Every structure is written in C-alpha cells, then in structure tokens.
C-alpha cells in the first residue's frame, strides 16, 4: 500500500472539488480524506491504496470537476499508515 499527499491549488473551493475527490477515490478503492485549507484556494488530499490507482487518482486531481480551475498540484509520497477505512471529506 502507498500514500499520496497532495495540495491542490486554484479555484478548488466552492466548486464541489472535495465531493468529486471522494467519488473518484471511492471508485478507485482508495481511503483517506480531502480537506479545504483556510487560505480559500487550496485543498489537502491524503489517499492510500494501490500505486496504479493512486496515479490515476492524481491525474483526476489535476483536472478536477467541471467548475474547478486547478492551477497546480504539489505532491509527496509517504509511508501508508492504514489509519483510514474509507474516503472522507474533512471540515
């Protein structure tokens, strides 16, 4: 199992980005969370699962849902913790 941490930047709040993220993560069998950051222009995403699924997920994060305007995605690969049983939206 692998862990992807991403900070998605741009017009990603108020455009259903976190819901899109949860839908895609669930479809790919990933666990973790998506959370709006306080600056109003970034979403933090942590996802754990199969490497191929995470790479597909990363491509989806780079495009986002129709109303989003993704400007950049900062990524890091970390050690998976297996602390997640599903994919959630954090507030």
UniProtKB/Swiss-Prot annotation:
Coiled-coil features, chain-numbered ranges: none
Catalysed conversion reaction: an acyl phosphate + H2O = a carboxylate + phosphate + H(+)
Active site: 18, 36
Domain Acylphosphatase-like: 3-91
Molecular function terms from GO: acylphosphatase activity
Class of the enzyme per the UniProt entry, highest EC level: hydrolase
InterPro entries: Acylphosphatase, Acylphosphatase-like_dom, Acylphosphatase-like_dom_sf, Acylphosphatase_CS
Keywords, sorted A to Z: Hydrolase
Claim: Kinase is one of the keywords in the record: no
Keyword Iron-sulfur found: no
EC code(s) of this entry: 3.6.1.7
Signal peptide span: none
PANTHER family xref list: ACYLPHOSPHATASE (PTHR47268:SF4)
Family: Belongs to the acylphosphatase family.
Name this polypeptide is given: Acylphosphatase
Name of the encoding gene: acyP
């Amino acid at each position: 199992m692998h862990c992807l941490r991403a900070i998605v930047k741009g017009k990603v709040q108020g455009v259903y980005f976190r819901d899109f993220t949860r839908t895609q993560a669930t479809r790919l069998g990933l666990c973790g969370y998506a959370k709006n950051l306080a600056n109003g222009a970034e979403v933090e995403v942590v996802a754990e699962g199969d490497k191929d699924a995470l790479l597909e997920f990363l491509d989806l994060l780079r495009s986002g849902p129709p109303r989003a305007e993704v400007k950049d995605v900062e990524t890091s690969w970390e050690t998976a913790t297996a602390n997640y049983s599903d994919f959630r939206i954090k507030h």
